[in-house]
Each structure stands twice: as structure tokens, then as C-alpha cells.
A protein has these predicted regions:
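Catalytic cores and adjacent flexible loops of soluble metabolic enzymes
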Residues: 1-220
């Protein structure tokens, strides 16, 4: 995070998308920074995107200080949230995707032992960076849409795993159905479980054997 006010003003007035890293900032400071930029944009008819990067300004960042859950808090600001990763390895970056990060920044080096400069130790070499890309892509696939819907593969087995309302025992014609008369078995090709109110208290038109479907057509 660069707190040079004139620089922030100049950057905001370029009218370009802005990505901001938030090291050594708390939530109140982040809000003020976003408001500062949006105010300039509003006064200059600029419409652009802001992305904020959760960041811990520590090299390397210790696992117990990575504070990845802060990504969720930053999402309350209704802008794109990313993660600037200074931990050793790629686990934190991959986990950040599951928490909502949509941009990943990771330092890159040809060799972790290239020099004594701290960045080389916490950076990813070509092999690890390739692994990071693949794991982030896979994490995105695993997250899915976020909507609890029946998946395509589930539709193939849906009828087989759902249950239907059947007779718990042999039921004679004119039996008035009660809870004790009902059972629920697979497949779900009959009246689905959860529709018991449609049959309870109704009279059977004809006999139903144990395990047979109870259908609306057979009710008076």
C-alpha cells in the first residue's frame, strides 16, 4: 500500500482500472481509500473497476499471520477481491480462491537460491508456478456456481436414489390411509416423499399390496 496522496490522485485520474494491495491497512482505511478513488471518478465521469488485494506486508508471511479469512470481510466492500501472497509455497494462494479471491499475485523467481535477497525464498520457481496455475484452475472448477442445484451427473441416478410412497403392509379396498400405512422405498418413480398430505385421510379405491405404490388415481 502506497499512502502518497498525490500519487493516488494521479492514478485515479488516469481513468484506468486500479488494483490495490492492502498491506498494513485495516478495513476502515480500505473503505476510505476506495471512497477517495470513487469520489474522483464520480467528479470526472469515470466508470472503471477497482480490485483490492488482501496482503500481509511480511516477507515471508508466516502461516499464522496470513489471515486468509480477511478476504471474506473485504468482499463486503462490493469490489473484486484478490490475494497478494507472500507465504512460502502455494497452498495459501490456492486456498484464497476458495475464500473468494479472483486475482492472485505471487512473486516469481528462476531459482529460489538465486541470491540472498528475501524475495527469492518466498517466490515460486517455474515448476511451482506451473503447479499454482493448475491448482488454482482446479480450485475454480471445484467451487462451481455456488447454487445448490442437481448436477448433470446426478440426474442420471435421481430416480433411482429418491423414494416413493408405498404401502407399509397389505391395505384393503376402502382403507382410510394413516401414517402407519405408509413406507418410503426406492426408486422415486411414484408419488415422491414429502407429499404425504396428498394421501393421508384418503380412502383407497382398490387393494394395495405391501411395497406397492400408492397413487393418486387409487384414492377416493
Amino acid at each position: 500500500y502506497n499512502d502518497v496522496c498525490p500519487m493516488r490522485d494521479v492514478i485515479a485520474r488516469t481513468g484506468k482500472p486500479i488494483i490495490m494491495s492492502l498491506g498494513v491497512l485495516e478495513l476502515q482505511g480500505v473503505r476510505k481509500l476506495i471512497d477517495f478513488i470513487i469520489n474522483i471518478w464520480s467528479n470526472n465521469a469515470i466508470s472503471q473497476d477497482i480490485a483490492i488485494m488482501h496482503c500481509v506486508t511480511s516477507y515471508p508471511t508466516l502461516p499464522e499471520e496470513a489471515n486468509l479469512l480477511a478476504i471474506r470481510e473485504l468482499q463486503s466492500l462490493n469490489v473484486t477481491v484478490g490475494y497478494s501472497d507472500h507465504t512460502i509455497g502455494i497452498e495459501a494462494a490456492v486456498l484464497s480462491v476458495a475464500l473468494g479471491a479472483r486475482i492472485i499475485e505471487k512473486h516469481f523467481t528462476i531459482d529460489n537460491n538465486y541470491s540472498d535477497f528475501r524475495d527469492h525464498q518466498l517466490s515460486s520457481d517455474p515448476k511451482e508456478f506451473s503447479q499454482l496455475v493448475e491448482r488454482v484452475k482446479n480450485a475454480s472448477k471445484l467451487l462451481g456456481s455456488g447454487k445448490k442445484t442437481v448436477q448433470k451427473s446426478e440426474r442420471l441416478v435421481m430416480e433411482n436414489v429418491r423414494r416413493s410412497i408405498v404401502a407399509k403392509r397389505d391395505l384393503d379396498e376402502n382403507t382410510i390411509l394413516a401414517w402407519d400405512d405408509l413406507s418410503w422405498v426406492r426408486p422415486g418413480s411414484g408419488l415422491p416423499s414429502g407429499n404425504e398430505e396428498m394421501v393421508l385421510g384418503k380412502r383407497l379405491r382398490k387393494r394395495v399390496g405391501v411395497g406397492e405404490l400408492i397413487t393418486l388415481d387409487n384414492l377416493k
